[in-house]
């Protein structure tokens, strides 16, 4: 349940805090961390904000902020424990009724069991809630995001045991596919989102993925990358970084790049992007264990001790960065924005003249000031780069990617194309002279 659902006088134990980068960090710094007890002290006359007590001091949160904090109600945990105890006692009575010949040892054993049960009954309600919170904390919500045909569905199938079709065709991954997996004591809820080249909301797939990431923020995103086309795939990675969400990259089809002889220091590339990049081959499971181990490390907050787990800002150049900062000043005035979006991400989208971002901002009280700041920033970018702001941002992202690949020593291999046979078949089947006769022939086979 959410912290906002607790009523005055009730208590709970925190399971996890969701939400985007800056907002999530601020809430955690206020003391709302896993395993801590929180008491609801007082609701304001208009029911907002709500005063809480945590770690010995009082703090107020809006309901919209408390919606991002998952808790276990101490009263509910006690109730569930009592139901479990009642079920256990019923089972014991059934077992006892089946015993015909008993003796003192049996009675003693039963007495010992009752004594153990009594000791368990004396456990505090808070301890019960803490145990339940710990159990729920071991549930990780993961979203799979990547370009079409990058191997997302193959990972989904391998990890969850599902049998989704692979391929970017109508009817395949048109909406989110949900599955489950267990690894090293953690339970993973997996969501396979539609393949998309960007988060620009020009297509239904792009809009759907973006909406899911914003409205149903996952604990971790697995950005699946087709390693045979790094530059194109990493463009989506830069946009996910803008959203300030925790992420791990799976460098999929890594065996194909090895066969081709590609050279890349993926460890260095990960440092430059601030993300762990794990070589994988989902068709045979190579790298999957390492991928899920890395997800657990990131989820448990070990990023501070690892250079790969650091949030970076893609440098778009002086004038664009100045424009982003200028817009952010006006966005940060409204706290409700920070609960839903990274203000940097929203600033970039406004500079790109994104219609959905504009629609969201148009309903804010400060909409006029925000749009004025955006227009001023876009004008400066145009004067500086001689390009509209959307094109300038795209060029800057590809410039960052190109520089990172160079620094990571990326060189394409000289071996023959591993898809040479596939490409040859494609050329034959799409030939205007022989393709149609082959199609007719196949219809009659």
Give residue spans per PLM region.
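Conserved G1/Walker A P-loop phosphate-binding module
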Residues: 106-198
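Conserved C-terminal guanine-recognition region of P-loop GTPase G domains, centered on the G4
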Residues: 181-184, 208-277
